[in-house]
UniProtKB/Swiss-Prot annotation:
This is Octanoyltransferase. It comes from Neisseria meningitidis serogroup C / serotype 2a (strain ATCC 700532 / DSM 15464 / FAM18). Substrate binds at R66, G67, G68, Q69, I70, T71, Y72, H73, S133, L134, G135, G146, L147, A148. The keyword Acyltransferase applies. InterPro entries: aa-tRNA-synth_II/BPL/LPL, BPL_LPL_catalytic, Octanoyltransferase, Octanoyltransferase_CS. Pathway: Protein modification; protein lipoylation via endogenous pathway; protein N(6)-(lipoyl)lysine from octanoyl-[acyl-carrier-protein]: step 1/2. Catalyzes the transfer of endogenously produced octanoic acid from octanoyl-acyl-carrier-protein onto the lipoyl domains of lipoate-dependent enzymes. Lipoyl-ACP can also act as a substrate although octanoyl-ACP is likely to be the physiological substrate. It catalyses: octanoyl-[ACP] + L-lysyl-[protein] = N(6)-octanoyl-L-lysyl-[protein] + holo-[ACP] + H(+). Residues 27-203 form the BPL/LPL catalytic domain.
């Protein structure tokens, strides 16, 4: 699995690059993780409803092809795009989602933050507050899009929407629990290590 750090990049060209990567991949294309941050942007998934945008401001909205509703990306949020051929790995999308959730939970545990997944709602939560979002697109036996983990960002734009379609959803971030707060790059080093562990094929034996 190749890990590519792209830094702070605009959302739309990154979205187009994901689609191109997935369309052009072959049976031998190596899976990739793209580690990025984005300037402020709302992204509206395939199930998105206009009423979940509560306040219209100057933050752009991009209609995209992942599952789910509307969410927000901005500087200080760690985004990891997961370009994974799950068919080749002989796994399921549900297992991919669990691997993403478990990697986030393990990363947060390294900072003393107790987080959990919720079987009724996508994402990772600290108590009732959401700290990470997940959204995937399944196409041709592969997935793309991925996860967004709030590290140290301006959370106020989340109040302009119903995050992921949930009215009143309260958001949180690593900076609410850890000071001095690690940088997104520092968190990325831990998170990608956990992702690599989750996606390393396990030996098939009876030992």
């Amino acid at each position: 699995m190749k890990i590519i750090h792209k830094g702070l990049v605009e959302y739309l060209p990154t979205f187009e690059a994901m689609k191109t990567f997935n369309a052009n991949r072959t049976a031998s294309t190596e899976d990739e993780l793209w580690v990025v941050e984005h300037p402020p942007v709302f992204t509206q998934g395939l199930a998105g409803k206009p009423e979940h945008l509560l306040i219209r401001d100057d933050i752009p909205i991009v209609q995209i092809d992942r599952g789910g509703q509307i969410t927000y990306h901005g500087p200080g949020q760690l985004v990891v795009y997961t370009m994974i051929d799950f068919k080749r790995r002989k796994t399921s999308v549900r297992n991919i989602v669990s691997a993403l959730e478990n990697s986030i939970i393990a990363t947060l545990a390294e900072y003393g933050i107790e987080a959990a997944a919720d079987p009724k709602r996508p994402g990772v939560y600290v108590g009732e507050r959401k700290i990470a979002s997940l959204g995937l697109r399944i196409k041709g036996g592969s997935v793309y899009h991925g996860l967004a983990l709030n590290v140290n960002m301006d959370l106020s734009p989340f109040t302009h929407i119903n995050p992921c379609g949930y009215a009143g959803m309260e958001m949180t971030q690593i900076a609410d629990f850890v000071q001095p707060c690690p940088t997104p790059d520092e968190v990325a080093a831990k998170l990608t290590a956990h992702l690599e562990t989750q996606f390393t094929p396990k030996a098939d034996n009876n030992e």
